[in-house]
């Protein structure tokens, strides 16, 4: 039996075109916070990988956590250009129910900020 290795030790650069949003993300971010996230990524770069599930059948990555960071890459031309369209991704191999629970846990762990 292989020892457990956390996904963060296996970050990969994946073309954003191979990444798809999930259809269950419950988290919403207001436009001012999205602008701040874009600025943060512009100033500091991507400091956390996007958590994805790899769908072998369709050869694509489905976002589990990091939807808004993914969205910034899709909507900010300057970031897309600088990053050459590549996103840092870690993969978790879980079924849909477990992925949904992971998404909720990640969102709740960050909490809300005022």
Q: Language-model features: where?
A:
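Noncatalytic linker/hinge segments flanking ATPase motor cores
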Residues: 3-5, 34, 54-55
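A short acidic-Thr-Gly-centered motif at the start of a beta-strand
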Residues: 48-57
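Amphipathic, charge-rich alpha-helical segments that serve as recognition/docking helices
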Residues: 7, 20-48, 70-114
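General secondary-structure edge motif
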Residues: 14-21, 53
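Short active-site oxyanion
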Residues: 58-62
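N-terminal leader/domain-start detector
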Residues: 1-16
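Short, conserved phosphate/pyrophosphate- and ester-handling motifs at nucleotide-, phospho-/glycolipid
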Residues: 66
């Amino acid at each position: 039996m292989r020892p457990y290795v956390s996904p963060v030790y296996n970050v990969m650069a994946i073309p954003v075109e191979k990444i798809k949003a999930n259809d269950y993300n419950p988290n919403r971010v207001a436009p001012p916070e999205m602008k701040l996230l874009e600025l943060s990524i512009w100033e500091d770069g991507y400091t956390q990988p996007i958590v994805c599930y790899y769908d072998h059948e369709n050869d694509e990555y489905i976002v589990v956590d990091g939807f808004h960071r993914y969205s910034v890459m899709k909507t900010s031309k300057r970031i897309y250009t600088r990053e050459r369209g590549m996103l840092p991704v870690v993969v978790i191999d879980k079924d849909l129910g477990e992925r949904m629970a992971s998404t909720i846990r990640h969102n709740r762990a960050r909490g809300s900020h005022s």
